[in-house]
Amino acid sequence: MITAMYAVGPNGEFGLRGKLPWGSFKEELDAFYSQLDVLNPDNIIIGAGTYLALPYAVRERMIGASDLFIRADRPLPDDITHDIYTPISMIGDTLPTFLKDQQTVVLGGANLLLEMYQHGHIESAFVSTIFSEQKLEADTHLDSMILDYNYESTRLVYAVGANSDNSLRFVQELVTY
């Protein structure tokens, strides 16, 4: 089964200068890691830009717990060695059977998610929608096809939360396709 996990603003805000538009949001990250632990994926697929933007400690947490696949159309820095990941240069209409038969989690970025949705590979998703008192600025938005697909699908609320001053809130939903 292939499950996506990602956070997005209410208007598709997804990234800002290689980071999250809302900055660090511990309460949502706790819900994310809790759900990732429950899923206990055999495989993680992640875009190169998303992987490289992760803090070192988060990258280290991914290594060894799951087989790591990085979607990259260019070489990664030399310190990211092939012994810790398998590169994916293209997402097509079919995927290796083991990715579908085992628990596989897709973490983003926006382009990888679009490729996976366009080819019908995503079977479910844990989507955290982030609400902010301030307008969220973004230079990367999740494609409207994904937003529409999520809007029209069955959604079950899994977690809700807010930061200490309530300036950020989230709703994490399981979306089934």
From Swiss-Prot:
Disulphide-bridged cysteine pairs: none
GO molecular function, one term: dihydrofolate reductase activity
Coiled coil: none
Induction record: Expressed in the early phase of the viral replicative cycle.
Enzyme Commission identifier(s): 1.5.1.3
Any single GO BP term: viral DNA genome replication
Reactions accelerated catalytically: (6S)-5,6,7,8-tetrahydrofolate + NADP(+) = 7,8-dihydrofolate + NADPH + H(+)
Alphabetic keyword roster: DNA replication, NADP, Oxidoreductase, Viral DNA replication
InterPro entries xref list: DHFR-like_dom_sf
EC top class, as a word: oxidoreductase
Superkingdom of origin organism: Viruses
Function per UniProt: Provides the tetrahydrofolates necessary for the synthesis of nucleotides and amino acids. Bacteriophage T5 induces high levels of dihydrofolate reductase in the host cell, probably for the viral replication.
Identification of the protein by name: Dihydrofolate reductase
Species classification: Viruses, Duplodnaviria, Heunggongvirae, Uroviricota, Caudoviricetes
Gene name in the database record: frd
